[in-house]
Structure formats: C-alpha cells, structure tokens
Swiss-Prot record:
Note from the entry: The mono- and diacids apparently bind in different orientations in the active site of YwhB, but the highly stereoselective nature of the YwhB reaction using a diacid suggests that the biological substrate for YwhB may be a diacid.
Keyword Isomerase (UniProt): yes
EC number: 5.3.2.6
Name this polypeptide is given: 2-hydroxymuconate tautomerase
Keywords: Isomerase
Active-site residues per Swiss-Prot or TrEMBL entry: 2 (proton acceptor)
Binding site for substrate: 9-12
PANTHER family, A to Z: 2-HYDROXYMUCONATE TAUTOMERASE, TAUTOMERASE-RELATED
Length: 62
C-alpha cells in the first residue's frame, strides 16, 4: 500500500488540493501498478512562519 506525503505551504484552494490528490494517485497507480483503493495521499500544509530557508522564515522574507 503506497503512502505519499505532500508538504506544501498553506493557501491552496480545495479544488487545487483535490486535483493534486487525483494526479498524485494516478501517477502512483501508473508507476507502481498499485490499485487506486490502496493508494493513500496525505497533504501537510505549513504556515509561512513555520518554514524557513537559509535561516529565515518565509513570513519574514515577504
């Protein structure tokens, strides 16, 4: 049973997340041969103040 975790900054619409889950599921199905019913996709959304690059939070870089 494939498990896929997508980590991204918050702010996407439900429609964007729905499309993402559908496309990731299809890619895993085509690549691994796993049945759609066995593929699990997690979306973890992060706030910009909980994510940093080069020692700086993204919320501080705006």
């Amino acid at each position: 049973m494939p498990y896929v975790t997508v980590k991204m900054l918050e702010g996407r619409t439900d429609e964007q997340k729905r499309n993402l889950v559908e496309k990731v599921t299809e890619a895993v199905k085509e690549t691994t041969g796993a049945s759609e019913e066995k593929i699990v996709v997690f979306i973890e959304e992060m706030r910009k103040d909980h994510y940093a690059v080069a020692g700086k939070r993204l919320s501080d870089m705006e």
